[in-house]
């Protein structure tokens, strides 16, 4: 059974939290509120998007599967591996400033590869994963990112815009709006997925703990497979089964073929639906009877074989997350709330001043690494794509996305 991650606050911090709550009205969006420093993670939201790639080998395994039904199941598994990897507790990462960038890498040998990383990422035969993110706008807080591995022929384009936090009385939540596109050029296949709602509950009553809830959809743009999942929410009096619970359906041609159940921090199971079992759903599942559940994901068996790493901070640009938030991060790690608040305020004031100057001069902010492309066929119309996509995969017959 899954368990909630409870956060214990000292009396002084509870008093600060209570004073903040008194300023809020239930069911209202929180657009302007400075969080106390003890509620901050020592990292930027841009870096937090890499949590999804913690078990990157599960992503690469998709390339090894011939059957399209099994590939889809493997992608669903990969999608679900990223949720339990977030830092425990109720702290949230920094809100990125406009123009902020974050870059990191995955490869088999960090120590050997890092000194030559710029050359390696240009080499089509080097198995290196590259992640780049940029903060596109501040209001709304839109972030865009790209992940690519030229050797694996995988490209991911992500656009995420967290909604303003909504205070619900005993909880506060934010829906992660946006679309993630995963391209596997070996199979000429693209999977598209949405994101759930994240938040904190137990603000007034019960355990103070994080939660994930809401509906998401995963679909193949090249086959008839799709998946609808619900991240379950356990309220003050809800069933303990709903703690980090998930349920849903995997479909083929809009017809259910698997039921999904479990907990994303423990195990997730799929079970064929009898009426149409055996018609679709992947060749390797043939050894399972219609009444037998199959374990799609077991967190205890996942292996983190490739370490995420970044260039040394002195080699990063001034607008990198590590540069911008260096002093804030240092003070959070030293439990120095006063210095944290002062350094954070300096960054936010600088951003406000620069935005005001641009408005006065009529200058529109232009992203450096991404460009806007209207996507009428996409539920999420405001989509930004990485500028260098055509250069990355110019050896392929069909140009990706663009």
From Swiss-Prot:
InterPro entries, per database record: OSBP_sf, Oxysterol-bd, Oxysterol-bd_CS
GO molecular function: sterol binding
Coiled-coil annotated residue ranges, if any: none
Sequence segments annotated as region (Disordered): 333-366
Biased composition (Basic and acidic residues): 336-366
Source taxon at top rank: Eukaryota
GO annotations of cellular component type: cytosol; membrane
UniProt-listed Gene3D superfamilies: 2.40.160.120, 3.30.70.3490
UniProt record similarity statement: Belongs to the OSBP family.
Record's protein name: Oxysterol-binding protein 12
Lineage summary: Eukaryota, Amoebozoa, Evosea, Eumycetozoa, Dictyostelia
């Amino acid at each position: 059974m899954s368990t909630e991650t409870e956060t214990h606050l000292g009396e002084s911090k509870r008093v600060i939290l209570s004073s903040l709550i008194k300023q809020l009205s239930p069911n209202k969006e929180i657009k302007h509120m400075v969080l106390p420093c003890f509620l901050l993670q020592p990292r930027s939201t841009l870096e937090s998007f890499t949590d999804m790639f913690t078990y990157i080998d599960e992503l690469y395994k998709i390339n090894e599967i011939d059957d399209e039904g099994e590939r889809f199941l493997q992608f669903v598994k990969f999608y679900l591996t990223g949720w339990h990897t977030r830092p425990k507790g109720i702290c949230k990462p920094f809100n990125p400033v406009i123009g902020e960038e974050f870059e990191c890498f995955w490869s088999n040998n960090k120590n050997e590869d890092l000194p030559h990383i710029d050359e390696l990422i240009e080499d089509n035969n080097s198995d290196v994963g590259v992640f780049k993110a940029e903060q596109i706008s501040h209001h709304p807080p839109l972030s865009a990112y790209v992940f690519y591995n030229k050797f694996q022929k995988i490209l991911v384009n992500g656009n995420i815009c967290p909604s303003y936090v909504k205070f619900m009385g005993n909880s506060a939540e934010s829906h992660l709006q946006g679309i993630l596109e995963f391209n596997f050029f070996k199979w000429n296949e693209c999977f598209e997925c949405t994101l759930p709602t994240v938040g904190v509950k137990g603000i007034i009553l019960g355990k103070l703990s994080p939660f994930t809830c809401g509906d998401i959809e995963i679909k193949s743009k090249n086959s008839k497979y799709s998946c609808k999942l619900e991240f379950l929410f356990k309220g003050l009096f809800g069933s303990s089964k709903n703690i980090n619970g998930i349920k849903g359906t995997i479909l083929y041609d809009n017809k259910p073929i698997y039921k999904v159940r479990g907990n994303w921090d423990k195990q997730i199971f799929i079970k064929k639906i009898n009426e149409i079992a055996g018609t679709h759903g992947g060749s390797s599942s043939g050894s399972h009877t219609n009444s037998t559940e199959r374990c799609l994901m077991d967190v205890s068996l996942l292996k983190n074989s490739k370490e995420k790493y970044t260039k040394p901070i002195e080699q990063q640009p001034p607008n990198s997350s590590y540069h911008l938030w260096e002093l804030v991060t240092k003070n959070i790690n030293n439990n120095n709330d006063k210095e944290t608040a002062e350094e954070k305020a300096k960054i936010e004031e600088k951003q406000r001043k620069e935005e005001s100057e641009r408005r006065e001069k009529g200058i529109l902010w232009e992203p450096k690494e991404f460009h806007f492309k209207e996507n009428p066929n996409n539920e999420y119309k405001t989509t930004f794509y990485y500028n260098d996509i055509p250069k990355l995969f110019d050896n392929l017959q069909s140009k990706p996305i663009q």
